[in-house]
C-alpha cells in the first residue's frame, strides 16, 4: 500500500484495510475517523458487540493474547495496517507479522512491546533516555514486593505491570496496606500476573497528557513531531474522571513537557498519536507513562480541536497531513454505569444536551458495571473553568437506569 499517496474504496479489491486490535470507545472513534476517509475497517475485541464492533465493516471476537489466533486473523483479513488499541495483545506475534511484511504494525511492533507493560517503558524512559521519573522498583513475588515498598517508602503507588484504566492500582500508606495492595494488583493485571511496579510519590501541582503526533510533513515528506495543547485531568484510583484543554502552565514547564514527549516518542518511532502522561510542579516535569494510541483523557479533543485525537491518529497512520491546533477551550466528564446490568438505558439525555455548549458520547457498551465508563459529556466554553462546569453538569444529568 502506498501510504499517504492513495486510498481505495472499502469492500472492493482496491480497499485500504485497517485492523484495530481493541474496539472500545477509543477504538470506535478511530474507526469512525478512518471510515470518513474511505478506509475498510476490521474491529477485533475479546467480547462481542464492543463499541467499535458496532460501526466497523467487519467484527471479530478472539483472545488477542493467543498468538496463533491473532496471526491467523491478520492473514485471513489481509490487513494493510494493524493498529493495537489495548495492551493485552500477543506482541511477539505482532513482531513476526511486521518482520514477515504481512502488515505494518502501528506505530511499530517494538513500540507496542515496550509500552504494553510499565516495566518496558519505564526502563526506556529512565534508564536509556535519562528522563526524570518518580523513584521505582519492580517485584515478582510478595516478599520482593514487601522489600520494594520498604525501599521506596510510604506513601507509594502499586500497579500491575500490565493493566489499564487504574485496574489493580492502589496507594500504600502503611504496613497495613501492603498485603491488600499486593492482592489487588494480582487481581487487576491482565497478563504477566505476579509482577508489579512500586512507584514513589511525586509532589506535583497537576497532571497533564501531552498528546504527541508523529506524522508525515507534507513539505519534506519526512516524519515530523506535532504537539496538541496540554490536557489537564483528574484521576481517581488511576482512572480518569474529568479532563480539559488547554491546561494553563508556565512556558518553561510546557517546553520541558514537549521535550520529554519528543524524546520518548522519537525513541518509540513509527507514526500515530501518543498520549504522554506527565507530572508538573512549577517549572519541573516528570515522565509518568506513554500510550502509543489515543488517550482516554483526550476524549476532550472531540470538542476542543478541529481534528480530534482520533482524526489525528487516523491521518497520521495513513501518512496524511495533520493539524493539531486548538479550536476552543473544552472539557470532558465521565458518565459511569452506576449499576451492574446488561443493556441499560439512559435517562436525562435531553437535560444534558440542554446545557450550553454540551455534547454527549454514549459508548454503547453491551454491559454496564457500577464503575464502568459508559459515556462522556463534552462541553465548550469561553474558558476552561466554564467548560468544566458545563461538562460536569451535563454528565450529572445523565442517569443510567435498568432497561428491565
UniProtKB/Swiss-Prot annotation:
Positions bound to ATP: 118, 159, 164-169, 199-202, 207
Annotated positions binding Mg(2+): 277, 289
Pathway(s) per entry: Purine metabolism; IMP biosynthesis via de novo pathway; N(2)-formyl-N(1)-(5-phospho-D-ribosyl)glycinamide from N(1)-(5-phospho-D-ribosyl)glycinamide (formate route): step 1/1
Pfam annotation, one family: RS_preATP-grasp-like
Presence of keyword Zinc: no
GO molecular function: ATP binding; magnesium ion binding; phosphoribosylglycinamide formyltransferase 2 activity; phosphoribosylglycinamide formyltransferase activity
Statement: the UniProt record of this protein carries the keyword Metal-binding: yes
GO CC list: cytosol
Superkingdom of the source species: Bacteria
Recorded family membership: Belongs to the PurK/PurT family.
Cross-referenced PANTHER family: FORMATE-DEPENDENT PHOSPHORIBOSYLGLYCINAMIDE FORMYLTRANSFERASE (PTHR43055:SF1)
HAMAP family in the record: PurT
Name the UniProt record assigns to this protein: Formate-dependent phosphoribosylglycinamide formyltransferase
UniProt source species: Burkholderia thailandensis (strain ATCC 700388 / DSM 13276 / CCUG 48851 / CIP 106301 / E264)
Gene (name only): purT
Amino acid at each position: 500500500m502506498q501510504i499517504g499517496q492513495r486510498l481505495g474504496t472499502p469492500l472492493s479489491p482496491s480497499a485500504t484495510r485497517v485492523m484495530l486490535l481493541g474496539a472500545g470507545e477509543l477504538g470506535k472513534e478511530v474507526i469512525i475517523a478512518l471510515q470518513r476517509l474511505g478506509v475498510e475497517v476490521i474491529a477485533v475485541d475479546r467480547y462481542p458487540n464492543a463499541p467499535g464492533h458496532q460501526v466497523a465493516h467487519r467484527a471479530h471476537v478472539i483472545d488477542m493474547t493467543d498468538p496463533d489466533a491473532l496471526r491467523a486473523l491478520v492473514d485471513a483479513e489481509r490487513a494493510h495496517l494493524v493498529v493495537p488499541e489495548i495492551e493485552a495483545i500477543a506482541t511477539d506475534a505482532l513482531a513476526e507479522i511486521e518482520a514477515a511484511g504481512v502488515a505494518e504494525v502501528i506505530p511499530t511492533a517494538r513500540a507496542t512491546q515496550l509500552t504494553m507493560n510499565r516495566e518496558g517503558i519505564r526502563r526506556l524512559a529512565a534508564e536509556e533516555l535519562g528522563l526524570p521519573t518518580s523513584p521505582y522498583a519492580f517485584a515478582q513475588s510478595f516478599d520482593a514486593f514487601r522489600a520494594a515498598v520498604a525501599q521506596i517508602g510510604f506513601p507509594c503507588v502499586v500497579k500491575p505491570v500490565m493493566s489499564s484504566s487504574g485496574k489493580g492500582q492502589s496507594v500504600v500508606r502503611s504496613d497495613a496496606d501492603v498485603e491488600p495492595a499486593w492482592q489487588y494488583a494480582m487481581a487487576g493485571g491482565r497478563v504477566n500476573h505476579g509482577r508489579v511496579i512500586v512507584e514513589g510519590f511525586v509532589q506535583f501541582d497537576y497532571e497533564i497528557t501531552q498528546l504527541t503526533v508523529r506524522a508525515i510533513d507534507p513539505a519534506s515528506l519526512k516524519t515530523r513531531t506535532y504537539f496538541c495543547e496540554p490536557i489537564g485531568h483528574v484521576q481517581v484510583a488511576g482512572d480518569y474522571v474529568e479532563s480539559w484543554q488547554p491546561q494553563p502552565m508556565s512556558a518553561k514547564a510546557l517546553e520541558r513537557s514537549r521535550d520529554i514527549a519528543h524524546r520518548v516518542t522519537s525513541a518509540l518511532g513509527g507514526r500515530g498519536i501518543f498520549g504522554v502522561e506527565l507530572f508538573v510542579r512549577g517549572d519541573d516535569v516528570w515522565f509518568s507513562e506513554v500510550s502509543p494510541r489515543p488517550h482516554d483523557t483526550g476524549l476532550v479533543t472531540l470538542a476542543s480541536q478541529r481534528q480530534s485525537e482520533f482524526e489525528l491518529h487516523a491521518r497520521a497512520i495513513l501518512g496524511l497531513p495533520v493539524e493539531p491546533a486548538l479550536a476552543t477551550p473544552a472539557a470532558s466528564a465521565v458518565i459511569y454505569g452506576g449499576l451492574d446490568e446488561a443493556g441499560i438505558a439512559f435517562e436525562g439525555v435531553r437535560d444534558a444536551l440542554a446545557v450550553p455548549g454540551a455534547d454527549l458520547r454514549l459508548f454503547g457498551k453491551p454491559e454496564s458495571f457500577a464503575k464502568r465508563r459508559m459515556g462522556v459529556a463534552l462541553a465548550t466554553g469561553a474558558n476552561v473553568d466554564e467548560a468544566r462546569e458545563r461538562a460536569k453538569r451535563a454528565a450529572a444529568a445523565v442517569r443510567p437506569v435498568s432497561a428491565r
